[in-house]
Design a protein with these regions (language model features):
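A ubiquitous short alpha-helical element
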Residues: 29-34, 67-74, 166, 204-208, ...
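Acidic, glycine/proline-rich low-complexity segments that act as flexible tails and inter-domain linkers
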Residues: 8-64, 84, 116-197, 227, ...
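Short, structured motif recognition centered on aromatic/hydrophobic residues
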Residues: 65-74, 100-104, 199-209, 218, ...
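Extended intrinsically disordered, low-complexity coil regions enriched in Ser, Thr, Gly, Ala
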Residues: 78-101, 115-128, 212-237, 249-262
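C-terminal binding/interaction regions
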Residues: 107-108, 232, 242, 246
Length: 267
């Protein structure tokens, strides 16, 4: 005897009009196959990520800032598939190629080329598919001779005068790493044009929050953000907008680091 089981959807949640419109703006004319294979999931996710989160009172960000944070977060959590899908959407929302490339370059100092290489390749592919001529105009502002000095100045500008001699501090066997932080991390990347210090600190915050396991550095860069004008409320908005892409544990860890940094800066 043939038994036929009918699968009945018990709790239907229609996708909101705002979510539909936002999705259409991100992916014009595209209909996800997940609507067929995973309808319950996609209804809940789309309504949350593309309506509830975006429209949460007091937690919104300008489009450019929001997309910078999301792309940096996806690089940090190694979400290459989602990054490739959303990069075009970020451009449709107005994020310029120079800023996109600078986010990717900035990531190398915090994630290493081993994790950033796929994102650099994907970025180049998407940009060229959209008619962007590569290479873009150069943004480097330092030379071999002055990168350490300029990097140190960037550290001082962001974190304060206490960083002036950091490059020559530390135990003899490892002080070269502090030197590299000055000449490479800050001298080669932070000194570039294309992103402001505030934008670089925000993207760095997103890299660290998304990769997890580096809370001391995340707390330090939360403090750096506050020093360059990205206050506690702003960082909470960044965490909120990126939460759908990294989940609750890392978002809550990031929030704890922001609270710790804000308390320290208030003393």
């Amino acid at each position: 005897m043939l038994t036929v089981r009918l699968r009945i959807r018990r709790f239907f949640m229609p996708i909101t009009q705002f979510s539909k419109d936002y999705h259409e703006k991100m992916f014009p004319g595209y209909k996800s196959d997940f609507l067929r294979t995973d309808p319950e999931f996609i209804e809940r996710f789309d309504n949350f990520a593309f309506d509830e989160v975006i429209n949460q009172e007091g937690q919104g960000l300008p489009d450019e800032t929001r997309w910078m944070a999301i792309l940096a977060t996806l690089i940090g959590c190694q979400g290459i598939d989602e990054y490739e899908k959303l990069l075009g959407a970020a451009m449709d929302f107005g994020l310029e190629p120079v800023k996109i490339k600078e986010i990717v370059y900035q990531a190398v100092a915090y994630l290493g080329i081993g994790r950033v290489f796929p994102f650099l390749k994907a970025t180049n592919t998407v940009l060229e598919e959209r008619g962007v001529k590569l290479p873009l105009e150069g943004q480097a502002m330092t030379t071999t001779e002055n990168r350490r000095e300029m990097g140190t100045q960037a550290q001082v500008d962001i974190f304060g005068e206490g960083m002036r001699d950091f490059w020559k501090s530390g135990p003899e066997e490892s002080k070269h790493i502090n030197y590299w932080l000055a000449d490479n991390c800050f001298g080669d990347y932070y000194t570039r044009t294309g992103l402001s210090y505030a934008e670089r600190e925000m993207t760095t915050f997103c890299f660290l929050a998304a990769q997890g396991g580096c809370e001391p550095q995340l707390t330090s860069h939360a403090a750096g953000n506050i020093k360059v004008g990205n206050d506690k409320a702003f960082l909470i908005r960044v965490i909120s907008q990126c939460l759908p892409y990294i989940g609750y544990p890392r978002s809550l860890n990031a929030l704890a680091c922001v609270n710790k940094a804000a308390e320290s800066e208030a003393k």
